[in-house]
Amino acid sequence: MPLKWSLLLGTFVLISCSSVEAAVTVGRACKVTDTMPGICRTSSDCEPLIDGYIKSGVLTLNDVPSCGLGAWGEIFCCPTKPCCDNSTITSVSTSSTTSTKAPMTSGRVDVPTFGSGDRPAVAACKKIRERKQQRSGNQLVIHIVGGYPVDPGVYPHMAAIGYITFGTDFRCGGSLIASRFVLTAAHCVNTDANTPAFVRLGAVNIENPDHSYQDIVIRSVKIHPQYVGNKYNDIAILELERDVVETDNIRPACLHTDATDPPSNSKFFVAGWGVLNVTTRARSKILLRAGLELVPLDQCNISYAEQPGSIRLLKQGVIDSLLCAIDQKLIADACKGDSGGPLIHELNVEDGMYTIMGVISSGFGCATVTPGLYTRVSSYLDFIEGIVWPDNRV
């Protein structure tokens, strides 16, 4: 059956397995490893048990299997008993609103020089990491994020963009990249009927956030000057009315500034509040994430060339300012509702270091054989820095 471009044109949301099937898995027997029996538990029940295994080096976060997606979040295969007496535990260390087109900037400049100093995005990232280190010290914070749900503080840059029509509606996501600026997709904010009102930060449950969340009014919207409604230059910046108050759950993220793609074994994730099932369109109230793999642009071009109608929106093909990513199992993807959210390059899961490599833009269907399209952040550093850090002030 042919795929419809209406799915591509909508905003994106995270897709995962059916929650109906997975909701009955709590308490079911499972295997953590071939030699370690387990039982399916919620993340809140599993985390205290798994903590000792991770600190002892017996398991890593990525070793914890998923039993499926329950009604309220991911269900994990958890060891049946706590790990390790004190004699077996080894130490673990850690390493340190108005909508307008922005002024025209020059073309892609990935690695310009700024005298003897760093470009603003790099300097800002160093400050973000310094503040994170000061806040967390050398304490290792364990979060169960190997599956779909995301615990508070794991992705403190995540922003939900609120629209007020006949009530509050969160249609797109974004990433906090500085104390007063959120990065998102241009198609989320490019019409009068699609004007965002505020951003919600620090919330995992988007409809029932805890006391630590912050809602901040959007002062202005800056759309890339070369965005004309197709799949190119799909990037925008929201300026907030005030600076955020940084907490453990609210903090800017680093931008990916390297023009080259990371090694093939790198870990990539998309995150957002989204639909659990493409048929019912029922949305998750909690922040979800899913692991993806980058697809080389030549392969991505072949995939899109096979889709009818793609030439209309991708007249130049899949070019260097885009990224392509896919879940090879065709289970997880971004789809309607998560546009503007991040494609995250995870550097170190233990100390929570990552960069925003892409902005969720579009795709051909959801969790299909055609990869999703993402705006490559490193192609737009001049645009971002000119708004967020004018005159190279960080």
Swiss-Prot record:
Impact of altering residue 187 to Y?
A: In psh1 and psh4; immune response defective. Reduced levels of Drs following immune challenge with fungal or bacterial proteases
Q: What Gene3D superfamilies does UniProt report for this protein, alphabetically?
A: Trypsin-like serine proteases
| Active site (record annotation) | 187, 234, 339
Loss of this gene results in the following: Increased susceptibility to fungal infection and failure to induce the expression of antifungal peptide Drs in response to fungal infection but not in response to E.coli or M.luteus bacterial infection.
Q: Which domain of life is it from?
A: Eukaryota
**Where is the signal peptide, in residue numbers?**
1-22
Designated gene of the protein = psh
For this record, an example GO cellular component is: extracellular space
Q: Which SMART domains match?
A: CLIP (SM00680), Tryp_SPc (SM00020)
Please give the name of this protein.
Serine protease persephone
Q: What class of enzyme is it?
A: hydrolase
Q: Which organism is it from?
A: Drosophila melanogaster (Fruit fly)
* Peptidase S1 domain boundaries: 144-389
GO BP terms, alphabetized: antifungal innate immune response; cellular response to molecule of bacterial origin; defense response to fungus; defense response to Gram-positive bacterium; innate immune response; positive regulation of antibacterial peptide biosynthetic process; positive regulation of antifungal peptide production; positive regulation of melanization defense response
